[in-house]
Each structure stands twice: as structure tokens, then as C-alpha cells.
Amino acid sequence: MIKKPNLNLAYALRTVQDNRNLYAAWAKDYETEFAHQMDYVLPQKVAEIFVEIGGVGPVLDVGAGTGLAGEALLKLGIESIDALDLSGAMLEVAFNKKIYKNLFTKDITQPIKTINYLYQGIISSGTFTHGHVGPDAIENLLAVAQEGACIALSVNRDHWFKNGFSIKFQELDDKIERLLLHEVSIYGDNSKADHRNDLAIVVTFKKV
């Protein structure tokens, strides 16, 4: 019997195919069974921080999933948004919301090919976490960003310390500027489940 998708299974993912399988099974009910029940506020917070640092479109929403961060950006006045995710099933849900101009099913641990322009902004909410993506993928994001692009990426706080994100950003010192770390709650006050006290670091910077 296939286990019902949940956060613990998501954190335990090991391979790209494991990731695709879990989110294919979860896509239809992801927002009702996870985002709403857990009071998942991280996408909104990442979008707000992106706008606060001066972020504008066109934006690439990395790990867009069902479009929660895209919806938040749209409400904040950002209208030119593309979506990228490993899960085609999750992007099908996002497509139906009519938020995104273009949608790409891609693995960001590999070089990214989208369309023939670079982005003025990149956001990511919930992708840099346990069982998902490590710090090396950040260089692939920089490759599709314009000079001066604003970038806001959430990183699960435990994942940050366990997987060398601070070291990676030191290595990127000549490629980025205005690096800031913002510690935020992943879930809101209405969350009653395990992990309700989990934190994320929203990393903001500009490409030079």
C-alpha cells in the first residue's frame, strides 16, 4: 500500500523520482491536506520579503508547486511570473489558477533552460529543505537571473546549518551583493501539527 503523502515523507525523500512520485500523489489535495491544515504561511512571507527588498518582475518562482507563492506575489502587484517545479502534477494545479505566464518542469540541481530571457527576480519557498535541494543549486538559479536581479530563497533553518549554506554563500561572494538573512516561522498560529514551530531562513541578495 502506498503511504498517504505527508510532511515527514517529504522530508525523507532521497531521489528525484521519489520526489516526483510523492508530489504526483499529493498534488490534488496538497493545499487542503497540507497548506491549509498546517497554516503554511511561508510562501506569503517569502513574497512579502521579496517585494520589501525591491523585487520586480519578470519573476521565476522556483519550486512553485501549486502556486501559493505566485498567488501571494500577484496580490502584492507582481504580475509577470513564471513557474518552475520538478513535479508536473503540482504545476497542473498551478496552471489552472492562471497566475503564471510560462510553466517549466525542471530539476534545479541541473542547469536550467527556460526561455530566451533572464529574470529580474527569483523567489523560492519550501524548496531548499530536508529531502529536497541543497546549496549547490543556487548557482543554477543565478545563471537565469539578470544583473541586479533581486532573489529571495527560503531555506529550512535546520537544513541551512546541516548542509553548508553559509559556506556556499561565502563562495558566491563575488557573484552576489546585499546578502541578508531573515528568520521566519514556516507555519502560522493556527497550526497544531508536528513541525508547527519549524523556522526558515529567507535569504535575500542581488546578482552582480
Kindly label every feature range from the protein language model.
Residues D136-E147:
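A short glycine-rich, Lys/Arg-flanked "PGG" loop and its adjoining helix->strand segment in the class I
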Residues E177-V208:
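Class I S-adenosyl-L-methionine
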Residues L60-I112:
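Class I SAM-dependent methyltransferase SAM/SAH-binding core
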Residues Q120-G134:
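A short SAM/SAH-binding and catalytic strip from SAM-dependent methyltransferases
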Residues M1-D29:
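N-terminal, positively charged/glycine-rich alpha-helical extensions of SAM-dependent methyltransferases
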Residues E31-A47:
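Conserved SAM-binding loop and adjacent beta-strand
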Residues N163-V184:
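Conserved Class I S-adenosyl-L-methionine
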Residues G148-N156:
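Conserved beta-strand signature within the Rossmann-like core of class I S-adenosyl-L-methionine
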